[in-house]
């Protein structure tokens, strides 16, 4: 019998109204949502459900919102068998909660701080990210090396799927790549709506502050392996996982390698839990033979639970 990996999306999947269908409709989800609200110092649920103040897109708000939505969905599922977990960037924190490494409230506090540090690291306009479509990793890496100078850098940041590599770095170089992308061989280069050079070595400036912050929380060995973004293999040791979560700030997300590692362990069913189907699409591009289930709404939860009574 094949194995199951539960996967969690990262930033970019947020949308106004997220998790509002679960609230007061699904008891276990409602408990998670209320707990998150009690843990942070701003009106998280108002931001998720209506975004009246337009702040959902700010990374210090986006991160706790996405973590909360994924865990609210996860907690509502009956008889979910898990062999491995994996998350994309921020989604890795949902994996930590799912596998018992972090208490949910601690994870909420950590991703809130992670977002604040990321937002404070560089003024708006200094760094950015872009998705390069139609080139493989080696091609993108060569282009980045050519564009980078002693003063400014651009690096591969998310190795998402064959033909989709996200780069990160100084904004002028991102803009140059967007402008020259086609002549460099890319089908398209799309700037991403992010406020900083995430997953690039520029983010090392917050390494020490973040490491000190997460040390105050209890980290437990994982109940089942978490395939980590930085090394694309399953880890269960709490200290190793914690170290890798710091490295994750300034290291590329090895999503292709992580997915292939899981398939090599016998995983043939991926369950994406959280808003959107971004990871489902990437996994299909990596291997079209695996089964993929998406759980992103109350209806999805009801459908799953009706089939797993």
Question: Residue locations for each model-derived region?
Answer:
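Alpha-helix C-terminal capping segments
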Residues: 74-80, 214, 301-308
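Non-catalytic positions within long, well-ordered alpha-helices that form the structural scaffold/packing
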Residues: 78, 182, 263-266
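A short, acidic, amphipathic alpha-helical segment used as a generic capping/interface helix at domain edges
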Residues: 252-267
């Amino acid at each position: 019998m094949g194995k199951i990996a539960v996967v969690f999306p990262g930033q970019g999947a947020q949308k106004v109204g997220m998790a509002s269908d679960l609230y007061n409709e699904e008891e276990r989800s409602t408990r998670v949502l209320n707990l998150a609200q009690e843990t942070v110092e701003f009106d998280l649920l108002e931001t998720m459900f209506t975004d009246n103040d337009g702040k959902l897109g700010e990374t210090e708000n986006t991160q706790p919102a996405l973590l909360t939505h994924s865990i609210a969905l996860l907690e509502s599922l009956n008889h979910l068998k898990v062999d491995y977990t994996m998350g994309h960037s921020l989604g890795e924190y949902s994996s930590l909660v799912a596998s018992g490494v972090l208490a949910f409230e601690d994870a909420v506090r950590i991703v809130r701080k992670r977002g604040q540090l990321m937002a404070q690291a560089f003024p708006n306009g200094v760094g950015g990210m872009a998705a390069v479509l139609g080139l493989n990793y080696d091609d993108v890496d060569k282009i980045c090396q050519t564009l980078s100078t002693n003063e400014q850098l651009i690096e591969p940041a998310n190795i998402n799927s064959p033909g989709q590599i996200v780069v990160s770095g100084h904004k002028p170089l991102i803009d140059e790549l967007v402008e020259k992308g086609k002549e460099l061989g890319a089908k398209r280069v799309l700037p991403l709506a992010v406020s900083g050079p995430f997953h690039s070595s520029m983010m090392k400036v917050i390494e020490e502050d973040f490491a000190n912050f997460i040390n105050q929380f209890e980290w437990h060995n994982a109940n089942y392996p978490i395939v980590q973004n930085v090394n694309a293999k399953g880890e269960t040791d709490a200290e190793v996982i914690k170290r890798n979560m710091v490295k994750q700030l300034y290291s590329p997300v090895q999503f292709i390698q992580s997915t292939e590692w899981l398939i090599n362990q016998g995983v043939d069913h991926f369950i994406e839990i959280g808003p959107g189907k971004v990871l489902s699409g990437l996994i299909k591009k990596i291997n079209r033979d695996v089964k993929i289930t998406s759980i992103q709404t109350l209806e999805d939860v009801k459908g799953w639970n009706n089939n797993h009574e």
